[in-house]
């Protein structure tokens, strides 16, 4: 289980990665380059870091309904539905108000100072809202691509929803690069320091 944030991706999500060895060698993974608190390594990159310098001349995004905007206008960066006035919470949440779970994604404005939540294929969905910290819209296609560490000149084809799907389903570029370089070094017999994983998940035991 690897944290994207540990490898320079400004996004907070775990990813299950399998590395197999037919020679019976201990499986290892790339050493993290960032850490959460910034004490031993550079601190995790934030949404602000990820979007720094982005020029989105023709932004593409899915629009919110006026009903959704009614509540998002009342929220600041880093807040969600729980910060709405008490008398509006139940109205805003509807049937989800009494359901279980943390529901942290409802009416969520992203925080500048933390890694982005998981980039999904539908950033405008009510339960997994990816609303910009200060603007009344979800992250644009290009902003979402930045969170997945795609280069700005990478071209996505199709409709706006198709582009979001391509981005949300992708493995973050920086994470894939770190894994690729690490595996090439292993295959070539280079002595590469790795992060040893000893835990066997019972989920995969036969």
What positions do the PLM features span?
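C-terminal target-recognition/interaction regions appended to catalytic cores
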Residues: 66-206
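Class I S-adenosyl-L-methionine
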Residues: 1-100, 104
């Amino acid at each position: 289980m690897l944290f994207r944030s540990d490898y320079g991706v400004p996004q907070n999500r775990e990813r299950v990665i399998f590395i197999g060895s037919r020679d019976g060698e201990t499986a290892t993974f790339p050493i993290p380059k960032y850490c959460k608190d910034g004490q031993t390594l550079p601190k995790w990159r934030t949404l602000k870091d990820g979007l720094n310098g982005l020029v989105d001349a023709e932004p593409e995004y899915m629009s919110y309904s006026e009903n959704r905007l009614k509540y998002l206008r009342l929220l600041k960066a880093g807040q969600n539905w729980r910060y709405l006035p008490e008398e509006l919470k139940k109205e805003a949440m509807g049937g989800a108000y009494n359901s279980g779970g943390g529901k942290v994604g409802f009416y969520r404005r992203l925080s500048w100072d933390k890694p982005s939540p998981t980039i999904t294929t539908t950033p405008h969905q009510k339960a997994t809202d990816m609303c910009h910290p200060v603007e009344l819209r979800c992250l644009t296609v290009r902003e979402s691509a930045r969170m997945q560490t795609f280069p700005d000149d990478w071209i996505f084809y199709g409709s706006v929803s198709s582009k979001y799907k391509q981005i949300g389903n992708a493995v973050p570029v920086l994470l894939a690069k770190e894994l690729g370089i690490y595996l090439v070094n292993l295959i070539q017999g280079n002595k590469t320091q790795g992060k040893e994983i000893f835990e066997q998940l019972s989920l995969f035991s036969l």
